[in-house]
């Protein structure tokens, strides 16, 4: 599989963001620090932001829109790993939400630099694990 050099260039950022987010999991709707990290990682303003969730929109040449969604929340379990980037609080990203966020942030970076023909919507949703987050985003 051939991977574009522009995508490869985002690899170090992807790893750094994933590890940063892995260290700071939050649960349910209490994702204020996580969402602040997301907002500070993206060089454009959020189109909707309430402190614990957010939406970024990139207009395209076409009226059709493709939406991407990722989860912000972790689980209320203590991490027992000894990684240098292990969780620093009593929660854990055990389901990959830290990776989903990192991938989505880097995808957004890519499309800011390489506009797409369709409009793109990036949805950062809280409370996927505990429920209610999707309804909040709608």
Label every model-predicted segment.
Residues 2-93, 102-105, 109-118:
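Acidic/His- and Gly-rich active-site-bordering loop/insert found
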Residues 95-97:
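Membrane-interface loop-to-helix entry segments
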Residues 99-138:
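Acidic/histidine-rich catalytic neighborhood of metal-dependent amide-processing enzymes
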